[in-house]
């Protein structure tokens, strides 16, 4: 039997959780974090990460929605990478877990290099 996909992906104006429904025509449905049957501490972390992400939205010019500095983004990315490992363990038996690990790990490396440059300038 096919497992439905459980996708962890941040987007503006919605939860970062997407779960497929419907056996004949699998369609992703956005699911509120509060509705997940997971560890309460992990649930709280996911809620906080989603809140932090939603805060970066720029109402005046949406294409410029971004973190204000490399440090805040680096901390956010690290927290996302930690939360995704735990979330996959929580739901991985029930669903096919989907997360763009390469993108997030690459972003962490980019930010790490940027921070090294920032702190090693004379």
Question: Which residues are covered by each model-predicted region?
Answer:
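Intrinsic low-complexity, intrinsically disordered or marginally ordered coil/linker segments
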Residues: 1-122
């Amino acid at each position: 039997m096919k497992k439905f996909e459980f996708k962890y992906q941040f987007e503006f104006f919605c939860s970062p959780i997407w779960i497929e429904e419907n056996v004949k025509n699998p369609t992703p449905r956005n699911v509120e974090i509060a509705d997940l049957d997971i560890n309460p501490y992990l649930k709280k972390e996911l809620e906080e990460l989603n809140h932090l992400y939603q805060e970066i939205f720029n109402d005046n010019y949406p294409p410029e929605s971004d973190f204000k500095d490399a440090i805040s983004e680096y901390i956010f990315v690290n927290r996302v990478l930690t939360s995704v490992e735990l979330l996959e363990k929580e739901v991985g038996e029930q669903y096919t877990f989907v997360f763009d690990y390469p993108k997030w790990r690459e972003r962490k490396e980019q930010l790490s290099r940027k921070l090294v440059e920032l702190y090693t300038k004379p």
